[in-house]
């Protein structure tokens, strides 16, 4: 997943070849200090290649697999409003453990949706990964700023 080339722009510093975790963390620090735009190709490349993790290909490891909708009703409401759509894409911000009160697990399991689970807390993120969700995951937070912050 190492980019084969760097992204160059006359007004921007290019990303150096990323070889390991320290390299991409260093590159992220550089982009953070520059307060690059959220759609900067260098930032997008680092996030895609080094932060977002692929969906699990292992069986689910849920605490309560018999509970189809752990969202306490929100997902059922959305499912109805979306006319029980199959094959959609979701973004869940604040995935917690990937199961408890999840608004997206029902879409993933019953409607064949894919998506992105975002969880900022490293401890909870480890729990998300243990659930073997069939969605992309990222251990990151959202920001009110239009540039990356640490």
Pin down the residues of each PLM region.
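Phosphate/nucleotide-binding beta-alpha loop and adjacent structural elements of enzyme active sites
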Residues: 1-150
């Amino acid at each position: 997943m190492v980019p084969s080339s760097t992204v160059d722009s006359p007004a921007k510093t290019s990303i150096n070849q990323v070889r390991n975790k320290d390299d991409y963390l260093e590159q992220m620090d550089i982009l953070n200090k520059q307060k690059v735009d959220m759609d900067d190709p260098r930032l997008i490349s680092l996030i895609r290649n080094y932060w977002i993790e692929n969906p699990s290909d292992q069986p689910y490891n849920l605490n309560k697999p018999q509970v189809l909708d752990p969202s306490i009703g929100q997902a059922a409401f959305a499912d109805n409003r979306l006319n029980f759509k199959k094959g959609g894409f979701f973004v869940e911000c604040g995935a917690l453990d990937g199961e408890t009160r999840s608004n997206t697990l029902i879409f993933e399991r019953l409607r064949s949706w894919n998506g992105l689970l975002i969880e900022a807390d490293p401890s909870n993120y480890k729990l998300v990964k243990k659930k073997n969700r069939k969605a992309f995951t990222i251990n990151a937070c959202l920001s009110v700023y239009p540039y990356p912050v640490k």
